[in-house]
Amino acid sequence: MPIPIKEGPSVKAATRIVQTAVLALMLFAAAIRPGHATPATDVEKYLAGLATWSADFTQTIDDGHGKVLRSAAGRFYLERPGKFRWDYVEPSEQLVLADGKQIWFYDKDLEQANVRDMDSTLASTPASLLSGGGSVSTQFDIKALPPAGGLQWFQLIPKRADTDFQLVRIGFDKGELASMFLADKLGEVTQLTFTHSSRNAKFPADLFSFTPPPGVDVIGRNPK
């Protein structure tokens, strides 16, 4: 984004991006088969067939009035159940990685890493659906929106009041995830654009593991 990791709220913001992107992947089926059953039904059917997903991404965060606050780019990887990785390459090298138990936030330039328990960080969030933590329809109100900009759009509003975001809008291009907008309760809007995606490809065994390099300051509970 870039993802500053010195303070808790910044880590929380990075986690929120991960949570909503995971949910976006689960809406492929609704975009592939518009008008078939309901969006929630299609999402749950699709989960059985989703093993891995990856894509290049660009990300911007604005103040809700069009003023860009931060921008970044990199590649995103997902492997069910419960693993994901954000490799930020612009404007600096940073990493957000979940190995199924912990989530790591690593900033190469700052030589700093923050590690958190995955269950407590992602509980009752979109990402909890990765490990079967509830159905889409019980956690979100989902509706199809009119096509716009050549994309098929869906809107998700959380049913719980204690979430960090107000709504998510997700756009698909011929069944492939292409764009996502997230409005949080602070008024900021995050936009993610995905390109060069790959579904159910085999990843290297060590893609979702992280060991802090020598000299890196580790904040939080180190699983080692």
Language-model features: where?
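N-terminal leader/targeting segments and the immediate start of mature chains
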Residues: 2, 28, 33-69, 212-224
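Bacterial N-terminal signal peptides that target proteins for export
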Residues: 5-22
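Short, solvent-exposed helix-to-loop capping segments enriched in aromatics
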Residues: 47, 122-137
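Extended beta-sheet lipid-handling architectures
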Residues: 55-57, 71-73, 86, 165, ...
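A generic structural motif
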Residues: 58-62, 87-89, 106-108, 157-159, ...
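Amphipathic hydrophobic-ligand
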Residues: 68-75, 187
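An acidic-aromatic
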Residues: 75-124, 190-191
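Gly/Pro-enriched, hydrophobic low-complexity segments
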Residues: 114, 138-141, 145-224
